[in-house]
């Protein structure tokens, strides 16, 4: 798993012109990093959280995740006629807040429009020419206890492979939300952004 440190994350964000939150304790940088193999159907991406702990120490936690839909949804003919939504790399300021995933458990839910690509012909290759922007129900949630294949776990959501990692992310979010409010910024980068 790719594990960039504080300085690498900060530099990648700066290169893109994105904010990187360094002021204040528990001011979260919630960052997804997409692996170059889009069509893997595995949890080969990483979701990380960079923050200053209460004593001022810089921390980065990394968790296996997917930022891509599972194969099931990519080929599902009953999905949106345009194809499954795939979140575009970018920084989405204040775009997520706590809500319920499928009405079942707390997670981070989309609260502002996001930009997505589609796989219109369902060949597991992104159609970069068309960009949709809107409310797509993209959440940041968990898979199973320790999942290895994405399959049905993601229809475009950002999904952590392990329940324990997800619970840790939500613990950090809750602590941050008490200080900075309920909305959190999510940044999606690619591994190429670190080269």
Language-model features: where?
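Cell wall/extracellular polymer interaction/catalysis modules
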Residues: 1-151, 165-174, 180-184, 189-195
């Amino acid at each position: 798993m790719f594990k960039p440190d504080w300085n690498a994350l900060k530099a990648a964000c700066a290169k893109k012109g994105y904010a990187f939150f360094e002021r204040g304790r528990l001011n979260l940088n919630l960052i997804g990093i997409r692996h170059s193999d889009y069509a893997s159907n595995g949890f080969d991406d990483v979701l990380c959280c960079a923050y200053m702990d209460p004593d001022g120490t810089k921390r980065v936690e990394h968790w296996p995740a997917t930022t891509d839909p599972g194969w099931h949804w990519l080929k599902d003919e009953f999905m949106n006629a345009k194809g499954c939504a795939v979140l575009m790399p970018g920084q989405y300021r204040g775009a997520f807040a706590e809500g319920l995933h499928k009405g079942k458990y707390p997670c981070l839910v989309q609260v502002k429009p996001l930009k997505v690509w589609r796989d219109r012909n369902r060949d597991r290759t992104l159609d970069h020419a068309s960009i949709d922007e809107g409310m797509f129900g993209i959440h940041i949630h968990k898979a199973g206890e320790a999942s290895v294949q994405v399959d049905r776990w993601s229809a475009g959501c950002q999904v952590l492979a392990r329940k324990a990692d997800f619970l840790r992310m939500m613990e950090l979010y809750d602590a941050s939300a008490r200080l900075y409010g309920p909305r959190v910024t999510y940044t999606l980068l690619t591994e190429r952004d670190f080269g």
